[in-house]
Amino acid sequence: MKKERWILAATILGSAMAFIDGTVINVALPVLQKALGADVSQAQWIVDAYLLVLSSLMLAGGALGDRIGRVTVFAAGVALFGAASAWCGFANSAPILIAARAAQGVGAALLTPGSLAIITAAFPPERRGKAIGTWSAMTSLAIIAGPLLGGWLVQAVSWRAVFYINLPIAAVTLLIVWFKVPRLKPTVTGPIDWGGTALITLALGAATYALIESQLAAGAIALVAFIGFILIERRVHDPIVPLSLFRSRTFTGANILTLLLYGALSAATFLLPFNLIQVQHYSPAMAGAAFLPFVATMSLLSRWSGALADRIGPRLLLIVGPIVAGGGFALMTRPGIGGSYWTTFFPGILTLGIGMSITVAPLTTTVMTSIEDERYAGAASGINNTIARAAGLLAIAFFGALAVAVFARDLAGRVSPQEAAKLAAAKPPPGVSKRVIDDAFVHAFRINMLAAAGLAVASAGGAAIIKKKK
């Protein structure tokens, strides 16, 4: 039991570091945009460079862990992530920061799938569900606590501190792994499917570029690459995505839900800080604190929902949770400009937190327990995590482009396209008040939240595919 606690501590710390970094930067983005002179496209790439590399290589990371040892690959990922975080902190331009974020993505791709696979291998079946629920609750809390931590660090120290904070976490994680976590033997032999890895990287990268830069040709390349990826996976002996896993209705339904719900969540966490800081004039710390209701509900309810899923099965929870989350997104269309936080953003953020709390732990457990062959635990974890990060990657690209399009249309003839690309940071020309800029952003934000609500409700359809507990 003591050994299991150390294993759980190491996997939670390492995963939390990567997951925090996926969201901690969101509150820093408005400050980064000004400090580095970046437009919204570059701000999207600062987020998406990390998500693109993470999404593309996570499957390879899971497969690598299955072949050379999950603990070894996990530790390598933690070390690389820490080094890349230091590089991010030293960046003095948007392109350098984008490159450093991509390096962080490589480290995260190595450590993230290994964490759940280590838990699956180290815990006996009777304690595995509780361990996965604890991991899910803590890492989900880290994801949502990211904006809170980021806001405080940006205001109290510097935007660079949101990256430097990873260094002590990485060091502690490596110490635990070195002294307390036993090594696990490889579970799979054979070469890694680098052809499939290259094609999925091309597909995701081209799709992201197509959405952010409005390039139709890139979209066509993405489609061709994805079709090629599917064809290769059907033919190679050791595919990076064993398509046989999708014969499980439960595994397929859980991943459909993941794609849609995490896409909606990523859209909200990307755009909400711009609204709070640039339109509502919250300080970075106040903007981070605005997420506290989400943090509180995740910490209080996630373990409860995981235990409830063990008793009644996950299907009902995975239908109800996304619908409640959709209500939270819909409530975030209500705020205009000004007003008390408690009557504007609080109801939506709280409702969203309740919906995600109902969903996250049962969803993670469902994915990991739907695979009968434990040899592919790393691949299953990698697939689900890849889908979650790819959902965020594509959602930020799509919803960011949608926001700019609505914003630019509302300000057509008043603001240049170059200024419109900065969204709420756009400088109003002579004769145009800042209120006009803010009104246009609020309209764009509302359209995005309605779309996110639709995605969340649609994600409940994935849960309908999941088999009922007998």
Residue ranges and their predicted role:
Residues 1-179, 304-305, 312, 333:
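Transmembrane-helix bundle of Major Facilitator Superfamily
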Residues 124, 372-373, 416:
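Helix-capping/helix-break motifs at membrane-protein junctions
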Residues 1-3, 431-438, 466-470:
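Intrinsic disorder in cytosolic terminal tails and internal cytosolic loops
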Residues 168-186, 203-212, 223-236, 462-467:
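C-terminal membrane-cytosol helix-exit motif in multi-pass small-molecule transporters
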Residues 6-27, 40, 137, 195, ...:
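12-transmembrane solute porter fold
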Residues 55-56, 86, 144, 201, ...:
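Hydrophobic/small/kink-forming positions within alpha-helical transmembrane segments
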Residues 155-167, 213-216, 283, 404-453:
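A membrane-interface helix-boundary motif in multi-pass transporters
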Residues 173-207, 245-247, 415-423:
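Central mid-sequence intracellular linker of multi-pass
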